[in-house]
Amino acid sequence: LSSLSTYAQDETLEAAVEAPIEEVAAPTFAISGSVDSYYRSNEYSPYTAFANLNGFAIGMANVVMSYEGEKSGFVADLVYGPRGNDAVFGSTVGSSPLVNQLYVYYNLNDSFTLTLGNFNTFLGYEVISPVANFNYSTSYMFSYGPFSHTGVKADIAITEDVSLMLAVMNETDATEFQDNTDADNVFGAQLGLFGQYINFISGGFANQTQIDFTGGFNISDNFFFGVNATSFTSDDGDFSGVAVYPQYTFSDSFALGVRFESFTDDSFGALGTYVNGGAVGIGSGSSKEDNTSFTLTGSYTSGNFIFKPEFRMDKASSKFLFDGSDTDSLSSFIIAAIYSF
């Protein structure tokens, strides 16, 4: 009996020694970002964000510092240059015109993350960084939708293919704090279903409501088809639009993509429409105007370097565009160079 007992104890000790020790990932600190510059052939541009300067021009330098611990981390995303200045325009006291994103997050578990701070919007297909966009110029929907939010959000992974995000935020693009004491908070939500996203925000000083769909499908290994549709209403006017983004990859280094966008401005001012009897925007249109744009972009990649030649044509419902004189059409050619790190 004694020998049997000793054997059992030895076996238990062996099992304890051989039991795998759960490893905890070490915290990581990373610096990434990009630099971009471009040449634009036309002195005049459509009324969209970024890539709208004449001749040889610079985009921005983007430096993103991030720290990821076992349960928590932060992101500090800084931008320098014209593209960055256009993206961060809600710095009311001028103390943070360089801050594109600045937030801290905490993972309660593998499925639930809380984020507090300033973060880029979850609406729309396009983003501020030129690295993540296929087209170098931007759409009207992106240009007049929100760029960023300051608030708190909860990201919930319901299953591997279904996710939910809920947020309470300041007035849209108010980077530092809620500067308008009369403004209500903005509430946001996102439902993710198998890689397709339905986005929603509502509230703020102008009682804005925006519903947005962003998605895409891999038609084949080389052919991707992206889709974005949005509807925005507010006391200051409305707009809506839809865009498709077919992209074909010919090789590891070259791809070709198209953006076709149809955009309607109803008294919002993006296309020079009237609001409450007064002219708003750059042109002098009616209370409702339309614009369609066709953008063809090539993308050549070599390591971290990206070269993008791009042709864009805008066609308006009336002469609210400007090309030396009022016109209803505008075309331009852009060559962009981007380096990511």
Show where each model-derived region lies.
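Sequence/structural signature of outer-membrane beta-barrel proteins
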Residues: 38-47, 79-87, 119-125, 135-141, ...
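Hydrophobic transmembrane alpha-helix bundles
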Residues: 104, 110-121, 150-158, 198-210, ...
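Detector for outer-membrane/organellar transmembrane beta-barrel domains
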Residues: 182-286, 292
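Active-site pre-Tyr helix/loop in NAD(P)-dependent dehydrogenases
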Residues: 63, 119, 258
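Beta-barrel outer-membrane channel/assembly domains of diderm bacteria
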Residues: 6-114, 154-164, 218, 227, ...
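Bacterial N-terminal signal peptides
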Residues: 1-3
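Residues that define the transmembrane beta-barrel architecture of outer-membrane proteins
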Residues: 54-59, 95-100, 146-150, 183-187, ...
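Surface-exposed coil loops of outer-membrane beta-barrel proteins
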Residues: 40-57, 84-101, 109-192, 197-202, ...
